[in-house]
Amino acid sequence: MVVGQRSSVTDRLLLKAKKMHTLKKYVLALHTQATTLFDDLRAGSVDAVNRGVTRDTYGKGEQFGHELVEKHARTLGLEIRHDHMRNTYMVLPGLDRNAPAIVIGSHLDSVLGGGNFDGAAGVMAGLIAVQAMQRAGHKLNCDVVVMGIRAEESIWFQVSYVGSRGALGTLPASALQQRRIDTGRTLEQHMREADAEPEAVAKGVAYLSPKNVKAFLELHIEQAPSLALTGYALAIGTGVPGHFRFPRVKITGEYGHVGLGRRFRHDAALAGADLSVGLDALWQQWEAEGRLMACTFGEFQTNPARHGMTIVPGEFQFSLDVRAYDDADVAELEQALMTIVGQIEQKRGVKFDFGVRASSKVAKADPIITQQLRDCAQRLSMTVCDLPSPASHDSAAFCAAGIPFGFVFIRNPNGSHHPDEEMSIDDFLQGTAVLTEWLATHG
């Protein structure tokens, strides 16, 4: 090659780099569209009673979210599909319609009185990425599928990843008989009201699989203030914790008179308090050792039908979620829990009934996709860090089904699952630009 003459390979690389930066400009130019999408979503699901928004799983709130994104997708000319769970798929056709697709998305339901961005940001990111590629005239080899997922928030039916596991054929049929906490009606009943097909769940029908999905990409707000405190706008997610859950644990002691001596008591409330203190002490010990875990007592109460100021509590009920980032650690924590429980039962003269157990394995982000996302951010002059997710996400269901996933976090200084959840549109578009470059490079 003549000195000073560029090779055709170099020219192609330079052209590709130029296209990538052009795509970023197209993403950033969609600020108004992104703002409008989030504003419209909030307006249609605002909860005046509980503050924040409520997009109830298989209810009017979640349904509004799906109708909103589907309407927007139609304006972009995307193909619209639904599976037996009534998940929404908005498809940008690729050059090879038979190639495994890239799915990008998240859930559209929320907790009661939650924030507007948890889950929804991942769906909106997919729509903005697709629109940017359309405007840039960028064609991908495979289909890009923006997925609005149903029923991720387990608070409603006490079951994890209902929509995604249903689509993947991994949701157990027993989940159909779980009752929604507010209506008392079963998941099966709610699904039928949404024109879903619960009988397909019972048959284990898989709409998505490693055969037709190349990868799953999820953008999500961080659900802790870590990024805000460290000055990062974005992070690349490295994994989703595994957990075990007991939605309804009951401690049975013995009701007694308020004047009863300590040695005669079988106080169920103090037994619950002992367990909370014991697990918190274990958590402090793990933190001191540099080991990551978390435990949460979401419900924690005596029986309101029988408790009173002058009565020793004979019943106590709580929910428990314990999580960690290694399956061996999760198993160790459950063993430690049962050891503590045995000590409390002997000390207080009470009995624990843990009821139904739910669990999920640790899901590690695909290392190749993770590095590719880091590289995309670097090429776009964005500074990112790695961050393990403190929360559970639909990505874990895809991972368990054998589909690799990648994850991008957006900073959120106020945490999540409450009305003050926060995300700037500028940060959102930066994260979406990273996903868009990944799609353009690897799609």
Predicted regions and their residues:
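Midchain, well-structured core segments that form catalytic/ion-binding scaffolds
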Residues: 152-153, 158-327
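His/Asp/Glu-rich mid-to-C-terminal helical/loop segments that flank catalytic regions of hydrolases
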Residues: 26, 257-286, 334-339, 384, ...
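Catalytic-core environment of secreted peptidases
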Residues: 72, 76, 88-121, 126, ...
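Zn-dependent metallopeptidase/amidohydrolase metal-coordination segment
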Residues: 33-40, 105-106, 384-437
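N-terminal capping segment at the start of a domain
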Residues: 17, 21-59, 176, 416-418
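A non-catalytic alpha/beta surface segment that caps or lines the substrate-entry region
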Residues: 46-93
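Alpha-helical metal-binding/catalytic segments enriched in His/Glu/Asp
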Residues: 104, 113-152, 245-251, 260-283, ...
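A short beta-alpha structural unit
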Residues: 54-58, 294-305, 324-325, 351-370, ...
